[in-house]
Amino acid sequence: MARTAHIVRETSESHIDLELNLDGTGKTDIDTSVPFYNHMMTALGKHSLIDLTIHAHGDTDIDVHHTVEDTAIVFGEALKQALGDKKGIRRFADATVPLDEALAKAVVDISGRPYCVCSGEPEGYEFCMIGGHFTGSLVRHVMESIAFHAGICLHMQVLAGRDPHHIAEAEFKALARALRFAMEIDPRVDGVPSTKGAL
């Protein structure tokens, strides 16, 4: 069964058209109308091996927040839909990713219980403007939105870093690598990887 999803979400604030394939090769076509976010979501697709197409636009003349958040919501919903009954997945994974002086660790449990803990960001990171439009605070918001709508438990920890761009990129890449391995089908797993029999 193909692990794919295609979701269109339209509100008065944004229009999101997102398609993904969990068993892809990391091919991406990303246009969120927010250049730095394009860069981050492209990295997320590339390093998770998710084929990812996103066409999004919104009221970025007011602020990029709505478009960024709504894209993360739809990405999380698409992950959940594509994972289906979660039979055969590895479920747990972690990844630690450097980018020059920055180091981020992501730990993922595809549990069906949404939870997100972000820690370790340097003081003032949330106020930094990255790429002209994207604030550091949006990184945490994206992680929370993905985790909540995908139904996953995510711990994201910044272990080191000074440059806000490097920190954010290390976080997105760490999430990508952790998702890649957590979503992967393990041929030794028969059914759902839970003692309850459901996730």
UniProtKB/Swiss-Prot annotation:
One of its GO terms (molecular function) is imidazoleglycerol-phosphate dehydratase activity. It comes from the Bacteria. SUPFAM superfamilies: Ribosomal protein S5 domain 2-like (SSF54211). InterPro entries: IGPD_sf (IPR038494), ImidazoleglycerolP_deHydtase (IPR000807), ImidazoleglycerP_deHydtase_CS (IPR020565), Ribosomal_Su5_D2-typ_SF (IPR020568). It holds the Pfam family IGPD. It is found in: Cytoplasm. The keyword Lyase applies. Pathway: Amino-acid biosynthesis; L-histidine biosynthesis; L-histidine from 5-phospho-alpha-D-ribose 1-diphosphate: step 6/9. It catalyses: D-erythro-1-(imidazol-4-yl)glycerol 3-phosphate = 3-(imidazol-4-yl)-2-oxopropyl phosphate + H2O. Keywords: Amino-acid biosynthesis, Cytoplasm, Histidine biosynthesis, Lyase. Its EC number is 4.2.1.19. GO terms for biological process: L-histidine biosynthetic process. PANTHER family: IMIDAZOLEGLYCEROL-PHOSPHATE DEHYDRATASE, IMIDAZOLEGLYCEROL-PHOSPHATE DEHYDRATASE HIS7. Belongs to the imidazoleglycerol-phosphate dehydratase family. This is Imidazoleglycerol-phosphate dehydratase.
